Every structure is written in C-alpha cells, then in structure tokens.
C-alpha cells in the first residue's frame, strides 16, 4: 500500500525569525456565530478541549536560509473551525515546530494522539500549535521554545539530553507548515519507547496514548499526517 505524500514542499533552512504583531483576522469576525457553535459541538464530543490562545502565521518567506514571517494571536475555536472547514482563508498558516525523534539505532518514534485530543488516533511527532508561552518579551515567536516545551510535555524528555540536527526542515502541506528538527537519543528505539511509556503512565491526561516505532517505509500508517510521511520519505530516500 502506498502512503506517498504528493504536492508536499520540503526545504532545509537554518534559522527562524517570526514577529508577533496585531492583526485582524476577518474569517474569525465574519463567521463568529458559526465558529462558536462548531466549538461547542466539538467540546461536547471531547470535553477536554479548551478555548485557549494560539499563534498562527499570516505571512512568511524563506530567504538566505532564514524563515521570516509575521504571526498573530487568536483563540483556539477560530483555529479549529478554520482547520476543520478545510482552510477557508488560505492566507493563514498553522506553523509549528515538531521533534523528529530518532533513536540511536536509526528508527524514529511517533506518538498516537489520545482519545481526548482534537487529533485523536493520528500518529504524530511531538509537536503542538504555539501559544503565548512561546512569545518572547520582544514579541518574537520562539519556535525553539515551542519545540522544547511540547517535547517535554508529551514525552518527558529534555531537549538538552538529545543530539540536535544542524538544520530545520520546512514541510508544507496545504496550510500546515511543520518545522521539523531531528533530535537523536542515546537509547535504542525499544528502550526509548519504554522510557516514554513510563512517562505517559505517570500523567493524569497524557496527550499520547501509545508510542510507535518507525524503522522504514514498511512501517508507514494511514494515521500519519502527510507531513510526517513526507519528512520520513525524504530521510530514507
């Protein structure tokens, strides 16, 4: 079975410079009532969903090895409706950092999203849409902080204990902009999986319900988002 990810753009780059600036998102204003009803329905389905604040991108370019851009703050209900409805405003992007977690034996690990999450059942690298915790006092979106925070929250692993790849990988799938950083552990895939599962077992509401080992294309699964498959295909090309 083929799990190829067509029309996916992958670019290697070195640095991220994204400002956080005020911006009026017309989609969120024009469809306010529909958005509120949609979120209420989604929250009835998954009561753990919370309408917090998130950061989205409204402009970007990669130039001279640097990803430049402008981001804005909005609420999660706006983001969720925009995503669930197929990106009706194609000038906005869901940018996020993702940890391409690699074991010492060369296998990669992905997590199965827990039933309480909006992406239940999907197989993801540790990642998450940035929120105000990832904004510096100088109004810069720090996606390195976003990466470290999501990795720690979802796996219990400190980024400083892992060997970081030299560059970022930009993977665009429609309005999803995944910024992946390879992080290599000292443990084998099996030992790393066991360690993360112990962490998940200590959490009251873990974001992952299981950890899968991916040793090659034969382990691809339809529950993997296109950006995960595209990144791994590029690794094993």
Predicted regions and their residues:
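N-terminal leader/linker segments that precede catalytic domains of diphosphate-processing enzymes
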Residues: 1-125, 129-149, 157-237
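Short alpha-helical functional segments enriched in proximate histidine and acidic residues
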Residues: 154
């Amino acid at each position: 079975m083929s799990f190829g990810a067509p029309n996916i753009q992958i670019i290697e780059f070195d640095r991220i410079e994204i400002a956080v600036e005020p911006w009026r998102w017309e989609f969120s204003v024009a469809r306010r009532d529909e958005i509120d009803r949609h979120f209420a329905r989604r929250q009835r389905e998954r009561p753990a969903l919370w309408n917090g604040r998130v950061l989205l991108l409204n402009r970007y370019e990669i130039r001279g090895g640097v990803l430049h851009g402008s981001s804005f703050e909005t609420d999660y209900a706006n983001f969720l409706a925009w995503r669930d409805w197929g990106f009706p405003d194609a000038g906005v992007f869901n940018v996020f950092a993702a940890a391409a977690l690699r074991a010492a034996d060369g296998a990669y690990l992905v997590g199965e999203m827990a039933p309480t999450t909006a992406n239940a059942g999907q197989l993801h690298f540790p990642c998450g849409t940035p929120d105000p915790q990832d904004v510096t006092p100088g109004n810069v979106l720090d996606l390195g902080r976003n990466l470290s925070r999501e990795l720690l929250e979802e796996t219990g692993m400190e980024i400083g204990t892992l060997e970081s790849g030299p560059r970022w990988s930009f993977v665009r799938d429609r309005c999803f902009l995944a910024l992946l950083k390879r992080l290599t552990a000292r443990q084998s895939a099996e030992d790393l999986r066991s360690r993360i599962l112990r962490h998940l077992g200590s959490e009251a509401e873990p974001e992952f319900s299981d950890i899968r080992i991916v040793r090659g294309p034969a382990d691809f699964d339809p529950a993997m988002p296109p950006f995960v498959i595209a990144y791994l295909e590029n690794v094993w090309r």
